C-alpha cells in the first residue's frame, strides 16, 4: 500500500464528503 495512493484517496474522499455535506 503506497503512501501516494493513500494521499490521492484522501483527496478524493475529501471531495466526496464536501459534495455530500455541501460544506466546501
Swiss-Prot record:
Q: Family per UniProt?
A: Belongs to the frog skin active peptide (FSAP) family. Brevinin subfamily.
Protein name as annotated = Brevinin-1Pc
Q: In which tissues is it expressed?
A: Expressed by the skin glands.
Which branch of life, at top level?
Eukaryota
- Provide this UniProt record's keywords sorted from A to Z: Amphibian defense peptide, Antibiotic, Antimicrobial, Disulfide bond, Fungicide, Secreted
Disulfide bonds listed in the record = 18-24
Cited function: Antibacterial activity against Gram-positive bacterium S.aureus and Gram-negative bacterium E.coli. Has activity against C.albicans.
Q: What compartments host this protein?
A: Secreted
Q: What GO biological process term is on the record, naming one?
A: killing of cells of another organism
Annotated Gene Ontology cellular components are: extracellular region
Q: Which residues form the signal peptide?
A: none
